[in-house]
Structure formats: C-alpha cells, structure tokens
Amino acid sequence: MNRETVSVNIKTLPPGPNARKWSEFHRRYAARSTYHEGFVWDRSKPAIGPFCTDVDGNVILDFVSHVASSALGYNHPELVRMASKLQAVDPDRYAGCDFIGAWGEDPEKMEIPTPSHLHYKLMELTSQFGFGSAFFSNSGAEAVENAMKICYDHKQNYGYGICFYGAFHGRTLGALSLNRSKKIQRDWFPQIPNIVDFPYCTCRDHPCQC
C-alpha cells in the first residue's frame, strides 16, 4: 500500500463472506451493543494514512479517524520511525468496543487473538456462573456504571450498594457515589442512595478477626 497513491478499492460489497464469518463468530458470546458488523477490520492487512483493509480485501477510507484521537492516521512514517528507534510497540489504538477487529480471514485460524477471542476466553473462565455473553467497556468507570445498571435491573431499583473505605471507582456520576478516597470527589454531586461503606478486611487470620 503506497501512501501517495492508495485509494478506496471495493472488491466485494461489504459485508463479504469473510466479514460475515467473523461477525457470526463474534456474536456468539459478545453482548449486543454498538458493534458494527458490516465492516470487519483485518489488522493483519495494510493500513496507511486514513485507509485500512477489511477481511475481504476491500480498502476502506476511515472516517472515524481513531475516534478523533489520532488524526495523523495509520503508520505515520515519523511515528513509526520514533517507535522503532525507542524499540516500542507500534502505536495502535482502535475502538475495540465498536468495531470488530480481525487478524486474518478466518477466526478459527488466527495468528493473534482478537477481542472476539477474548469473549470466548471469558466464557471459559466464568463457565461456572452460566453467563451467556460478555460486554467490554472503554474504562473502569464505564465498567462500574454498567455493573451498577445490571444490579439495579436485577433488583428492580431496590437494595444497597457496598463499597470500601479508600475506594476509587471513577469520575463518572454514578461511580462517584462509590468513591471513598477523597471527599472532594463527591462534594456537590447528587448521590445514588443506599450506598454503604465498610473497612476493607486485610486480616490474614482464620477465622477473620476484623
């Protein structure tokens, strides 16, 4: 892929057969959320500037621009040169909670695991709980917020939340109610009711002497 001459090239109208294969593989254990199934980015294929390649070989113009966080595009020569000089990992950040990222054409024959494969691994590790799907969040605060929503949905807005002294769970509004690290983090903000805090048990004795 040449930075100066590359252009959009659609070989197979998306979603092509490989994209459908990856989408089906991904949907098995991924909770339905904002994933866009029409485009499956093949991260083993060339990407340069604002162009990237999907699993069916289509060269796509990326209007997302890394969600506006990296407008220089993919594989900027100066960034690649500096990363190589520092022996650093190639700069790579994509919206893994929004796009299905593939590595190769077949999810069953991948060289590098993807977020889709992590869903399968999570189901394996938590099989004793009977979960049917996994949901990835962009940050710890988002994970806490979604966990709180699941609890409220299960209890139908009834019950208590528990946190520990010194806890920090994030700066989003719901997570602030669980923070006990600094008082200023909760001042003047509305609080979710029925949050109870406890000292964290550090006792090594059995039975516990806390």
Predicted regions: what they are:
Residues 5-11, 16, 59-156:
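Glycine-rich loop-to-alpha-helix module at the N-terminal edge of alpha/beta enzyme cores
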Residues 119-210:
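PLP-dependent aspartate aminotransferase-fold enzymes
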Residues 41-64:
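Active-site and channel-lining beta-strand-loop segments
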Residues 53, 73, 175-179:
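Short beta-strand-to-turn element immediately C-terminal to the catalytic PLP-Schiff-base lysine
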Residues 36-40, 184:
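Short, P/G- and charge-enriched loop/turn segments at secondary-structure junctions
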Residues 34-37, 45-48, 130:
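Short, basic and Ser/Thr-rich N-terminal targeting/leader segments
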Residues 1-37:
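Short, compositionally biased leader-like segments
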